[in-house]
């Protein structure tokens, strides 16, 4: 058996994340590919979590294939650590399927136009970010984003420390706009935390709801699924709001007033807002501004899951907006293809130009 680039990417996911849920791994790669590596004892299933992890043989193969890897750390099997790693993997697999390189080890890699740095791999095992809760950094399109996992019961965060570390460690990287991403398995999970009744805090820590309310940076909600993958691809297109608005509205497109930056266009006299990035605070600002302008409704355009699970309930059913779904043809016009990224099923070649096969694994 000659190992493919896909096989090596599976192993790299487990080196970077330590644990990846079986259903998440087989959602990106085929069951056959995962099972082959398990049969070869390069990976194993940790039954209590139903998550895969690397074996010693898998580690040796990776180290033969790649000269630079994040420091190998033995998996910790405490429930809290395992859950944290699994959540990290969900963000990472979603970003990978959006076509963003994810196997990075330090902040300097983020100088590339599109790059993702999971915090588990930052600076080869050291932690210059202190006790911050950022899960990953993402440079895509015009944005430099800090991603946080936000789900019910996630706890509190020291916002000042987070923003200071974010700015200090990315200051040398050119990006037009800093932003924050709240990620979870679904939009419902994120909103379950943001909409929950918050206990009053007497410390410098803040709940994620308080962060949501006071943060000045753009803030996007991101599910770790196919919709999240499409959302990340849209975010990666410079000037995506205007481009999508023009694609959707065609000859009906009218530029928004210069002093109405929360609008993306005017459509039949109503403010048009591109909601595919799930910046709900921007939508709320558009609703409030439209009301002050004497307009009863705005128009939203979003991906189907976004409309069905969030926007219809919050805006259409309350009479604040008309909600339209973005068509497949409009997305193809913007992105070229809506299919998730898949690595080529080709033999993996080392820097020396040789392939990797099973026999070297027999060596002690």
Kindly label every feature range from the protein language model.
Residues 1-28:
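Short amphipathic alpha-helical interface segments
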Residues 2-4, 22, 195-364:
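Non-catalytic C-terminal interaction segments of nucleic acid-processing enzymes
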Residues 26-44:
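Short amphipathic alpha-helical interaction segments
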Residues 44-69:
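Accessory beta->alpha helical hairpin/"wing" motif in late/C-terminal subdomains of nucleic-acid enzymes
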Residues 67-78:
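A short, surface-exposed helix-loop junction/capping segment
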Residues 76-174:
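Exposed, interaction-prone assembly regions rather than primary DNA-binding/catalytic cores
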Residues 91, 125-137, 174-178, 198-200, ...:
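Long, low-complexity interaction regions most often at the N-terminus
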Residues 140-146, 151-235:
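Long low-complexity, intrinsically disordered regions
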